[in-house]
Amino acid sequence: MAWQPADNRYDTMTYNRVGRSGLKLPAISLGLWHNFGDDTPHERKVDMCRTAFDLGITHFDLANNYGPPAGTAETAFGEILRSDFAGLRDELIISSKAGYGMWPGPYGEWGSRKYVIASCDQSLKRM
């Protein structure tokens, strides 16, 4: 039987406005840093995301270097997004960030325009 999110998932979570943007974020977000790499079984990652969402956690925080190894957290979350959350995408806030070394050479780290654009493109492909 396919997983169905809890009907009461928004009843107990506190949501706070983000500045004057109108966006509301849950008081707790799920960060996918060291718990979403290749060393964590995929089913455990799925369970974490499902449980978080059932508790009203709608913000999933990633980065291009999360894993380990770098990038694997975005890849794993992308698989879960397609398999479990495909019909729920409009209920989620997914953030990613860039800044740390990802590839060799002078353009593989920090904040140059080239690095940020390439990192965004790569993150979108992984997810």
Regions found by a protein language model. Name each.
Residues 103-127:
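Glycine/proline-rich, positively charged
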Residues 52, 97, 126:
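Conserved catalytic core of Hanks-type protein kinase domains
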Residues 76-80, 93, 97, 115-122:
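Generic beta-strand or strand-like secondary-structure segments
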Residues 1-93:
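N-terminal binding-site loop/beta-alpha segment at the start of enzyme catalytic domains
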Residues 84-111:
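Structural motif corresponding to the early beta-alpha repeats
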